[in-house]
Amino acid sequence: FENEFVYLQKPTPSLYSLAGGQDVVYIGSFSRLLLPSIRISFMVLPPGLLAAYKEKAACYNQTASKAEQIALCQFIRDGHLAAQTRKLRRLYSSKLHQLLQEVERVFGTEVPIKIGAAGTSLALTLSTKLSKDALSRKARAQGLGLQIQKEGPEGITVILSCSSMKTEDFLPALTLLRKIVTEP
């Protein structure tokens, strides 16, 4: 869960605060904030687990490049990571707003829309006679990849992400999705 992209609602409290300051381990990576090809992950351990970690860490190899780690450290130290985060927040906020506009343009008010907690996705519940498998198959056959969240009596809920899609592709993809769910 990426709280740095939560801008449409109050951010979720950290696990550490929810656990009352008890033993919580944070594990993450910089793939979303920087480049997916930068395979540097991080782990934040509470002091009480550090000794156990050090005992086990010797059994594992470090696979991240030292040069990349040093460059990332300097990037963070110089404030560039914070600037990159602000830039991506603005970008994703704009793209999500555009996606919402295009959904309303194509589907009107006939589909329930829920905005994802991380601010980069929407959940649409589509009323269709298709099963989720049939919808997925028909969409795939026409070059549209769908992430189906659930199928229920109210319809099929699909997740639309704005983070990895160009804004100019929103309208054609949504138009195709509408055609797929409405055609007999």
Regions found by a protein language model. Give the residues of each.
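Conserved N-terminal glycine/acidic-rich loop preference
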Residues: T63-Q69, K95, T120-L144
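Short, conserved catalytic or adaptor-binding loops enriched in Gly and charged residues
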Residues: L15-G20, R105
